[in-house]
Amino acid sequence: MLTQLKAKSEGKLAKQICKVVLDHFEKQYSKELGDAWNTVREILTSPSCWQYAVLLNRFNYPFELEKDLHLKGYHTLSQGSLPNYPKSVKCYLSRTPGRIPSERHQIGNLKKYYLLNAASLLPVLALELRDGEKVLDLCAAPGGKSIALLQCACPGYLHCNEYDSLRLRWLRQTLESFIPQPLINVIKVSELDGRKMGDAQPEMFDKVLVDAPCSNDRSWLFSSDSQKASCRISQRRNLPLLQIELLRSAIKALRPGGILVYSTCTLSKAENQDVISEILNSHGNIMPMDIKGIARTCSHDFTFAPTGQECGLLVIPDKGKAWGPMYVAKLKKSWSTGKW
């Protein structure tokens, strides 16, 4: 069952690195990451080094697969060392590159596992979802973090929003593939501009996840069209504004005392720390929450950027720990502004 997909791996190796993007990254990230950029660049440009974690679906638990994973040397994320780590979440990691086959979508049959970059589970764990809570996944497609949220707890209400119509279809299929019908009934899927969610549903949610549209460094680095890649470089400077607007909307949708987690899959300081700094400077009712404990307890599985992350964590790809990029920041809303 754990035969690696050599054809897919070779396909990735055949992809060409986009020199325009790599040069852009080199100029920016060598300054922002310092010496760490050399290793990060090596991993990002070598798909043969990439790793894939296996998140088991508690609604159709694959006991035989779990045995196979143990035999192959896989281990569970954090092995229970994280505070408030849900026992229902089983995510298996391997130190060696490779992946197991993806399962096909079959109507009426729940998938047994979800393949993901292990770092993408950290925003979900940081949210600390509890049974019965109302939660919003503001930018939910393709659905991996929504699936992970439902492995953690059974919310009273889960609102999965995605503005892009093509990605929305992907999101719906993902949910149908992993979640049983009784739980589907507590999930709402919408196609609303995330910047308007706060006005549409003010102070509705206990927890909000904003996995924001971002540069998506891994994918962008292998752009097949250099002209489009160059265009994206100029458009990239507009992303922080969008991210800030999404966060402001999310804050409106969050009840007083509620928790918001912001995440991206880019190394960019402008899209990570600078965005959070702008929110903290412009919202007196928003306070940063310390998540440095995650870095301390997960250091055996992830490498974190050592500096420049005052209000969050940045997972950077490393040898034997090829997870990330993934930025995570956790915020708390202290009181209501009463302005919608």
Curated annotation (Swiss-Prot):
**UniProt keyword list:** Disease variant, Methyltransferase, Mitochondrion, Primary mitochondrial disease, RNA-binding, S-adenosyl-L-methionine, Transferase, tRNA-binding
Q: Which reaction does it catalyse?
A: cytidine(34) in mitochondrial tRNA + S-adenosyl-L-methionine = 5-methylcytidine(34) in mitochondrial tRNA + S-adenosyl-L-homocysteine + H(+)
**Alphabetized SUPFAM superfamilies for the sequence:** S-adenosyl-L-methionine-dependent methyltransferases (SSF53335)
The catalytic activity of this protein is classed by the Enzyme Commission as 2.1.1.-
Active site located where?
A: 265
Q: Could you state a single Gene Ontology molecular function term? A: tRNA (cytidine-5-)-methyltransferase activity
User: Does this UniProt record's set of keywords contain Methyltransferase?
Assistant: yes
List the Pfam families hit by this protein, alphabetically: Methyltr_RsmB-F
GO annotation terms (biological process): regulation of mitochondrial translation; rRNA methylation; tRNA wobble base cytosine methylation
PANTHER family in the cross-refs = NCL1 YEAST -RELATED NOL1/NOP2/FMU SUN DOMAIN-CONTAINING, TRNA (CYTOSINE(34)-C(5))-METHYLTRANSFERASE, MITOCHONDRIAL
Q: Family, per the entry?
A: Belongs to the class I-like SAM-binding methyltransferase superfamily. RsmB/NOP family.
Provide the function of this protein.
Answer: Mitochondrial tRNA methyltransferase that mediates methylation of cytosine to 5-methylcytosine (m5C) at position 34 of mt-tRNA(Met). mt-tRNA(Met) methylation at cytosine(34) takes place at the wobble position of the anticodon and initiates the formation of 5-formylcytosine (f(5)c) at this position. mt-tRNA(Met) containing the f(5)c modification at the wobble position enables recognition of the AUA codon in addition to the AUG codon, expanding codon recognition in mitochondrial translation.
Q: What protein is this chain from?
A: tRNA (cytosine(34)-C(5))-methyltransferase, mitochondrial
Q: Native species of this protein?
A: Homo sapiens
Its gene name is: NSUN3
